[in-house]
Every structure is written in structure tokens, then in C-alpha cells.
């Protein structure tokens, strides 16, 4: 476990508990995703790392870039101020990732990685999501990527479960059985 994860965990847990109490899990997910994306831009990273930029300037930048939602949210503004004062802004991507883990556990959602040979239609995505939800007894969130080297089919990873329905996987299994 990295030091950044250890440092980010209490922030993520506190944000999650606040969002849960306020029943605003998805809103906070959006906020954290946006903040994480902003601090990862080269310009923001350079500005935050610059010793000449003050905490107030960094806070103002984040609130300005993130828009009007942020100006009305005291808890979010306090979070930005706290992270800035403690020099933890660059932990926002880690905080966001940990928050999403807590949220998924709370909502009983499992993130499923699907690597497909070609683009899946919305109907195929819906059928796959329903089938996996039924098999895993949880809601699933599909994270789909394309890999033409699969030659056809798809590779599905859900936690410890791996389903290799790709042509490449079947050819590898056939080659292994013929070699034995």
C-alpha cells in the first residue's frame, strides 16, 4: 500500500460519511471526479507545485474552474480549503478512487471490466449488465474497452471472477490441449 493511499483514506472516508449522511453520494462522486481531473491537468499541477502560488490563489482557481455548483456548497469549499492548507490537493485522484470504492460497497455495485473485440451496442451492454447482475447477485457497473487483438468475443473481469469468451482465449486453450 502506498503512502498516498494511507494519507488519502481518512479524507475519502470522511467525505463518504458526509455524503451518505446528506444522501448525496452521486453528487459528491461528480465533485470529486471533476476536482481530480482538474488537478491532473498539467497547468493545474504546475500551479499547485509552484511555491509562489498561495493557498488562497489555489482555492480560488479550483472554485473558479469548477463552476457555480462549488460556490454554493460550503462543505465542498471547506474540503478544498482543508486539502489546500494541508498541501494535499494532489491526492484528489486517490481520494476520488477510494471514495468510489466506499460508494460501490454501500450501493452493492461491482465494477466489471469488459474488454471487447468491437464496440458493444447499448442493447448488448444492457443484456450483459443484467446477466452479470443476476449471476453475481449485485448491481454491476460496466467499464468497457476495445481490444482488436482478442480476434472476437470479450474478456470479462469482475473482482476475482474472469470469464474469457474471446477467440484468442479459446485458441490459447485449444493450443494448450493439443500440446498436452
UniProtKB/Swiss-Prot annotation:
GO CC annotation terms, alphabetical: plasma membrane; proton-transporting ATP synthase complex
Quaternary structure annotation from Swiss-Prot or TrEMBL: F-type ATPases have 2 components, F(1) - the catalytic core - and F(0) - the membrane proton channel. F(1) has five subunits: alpha(3), beta(3), gamma(1), delta(1), epsilon(1). F(0) has three main subunits: a(1), b(2) and c(10-14). The alpha and beta chains form an alternating ring which encloses part of the gamma chain. F(1) is attached to F(0) by a central stalk formed by the gamma and epsilon chains, while a peripheral stalk is formed by the delta and b chains.
Subcellular location: Cell inner membrane
Statement: the UniProt record of this protein carries the keyword Endoplasmic reticulum: no
Source organism: Legionella pneumophila subsp. pneumophila (strain Philadelphia 1 / ATCC 33152 / DSM 7513)
Record-linked NCBIfam families: ATP_synt_delta, PRK05758.2-2
A molecular function GO annotation: proton-transporting ATP synthase activity, rotational mechanism
Record SUPFAM superfamilies: N-terminal domain of the delta subunit of the F1F0-ATP synthase
InterPro entries: ATP_synth_OSCP/delta_N_sf (IPR026015), ATPase_OSCP/d_CS (IPR020781), ATPase_OSCP/dsu (IPR000711)
Family that this chain belongs to: Belongs to the ATPase delta chain family.
Keyword set, alphabetical order: ATP synthesis, Cell inner membrane, Cell membrane, CF(1), Hydrogen ion transport, Ion transport, Membrane, Transport
PROSITE patterns: ATPASE_DELTA (PS00389)
UniProt entry tagged with the keyword DNA-binding: no
Protein role: F(1)F(0) ATP synthase produces ATP from ADP in the presence of a proton or sodium gradient. F-type ATPases consist of two structural domains, F(1) containing the extramembraneous catalytic core and F(0) containing the membrane proton channel, linked together by a central stalk and a peripheral stalk. During catalysis, ATP synthesis in the catalytic domain of F(1) is coupled via a rotary mechanism of the central stalk subunits to proton translocation. This protein is part of the stalk that links CF(0) to CF(1). It either transmits conformational changes from CF(0) to CF(1) or is implicated in proton conduction.
Chief localisation class: membrane
Record membrane topology: Peripheral membrane protein
Name under which the protein is recorded: ATP synthase subunit delta
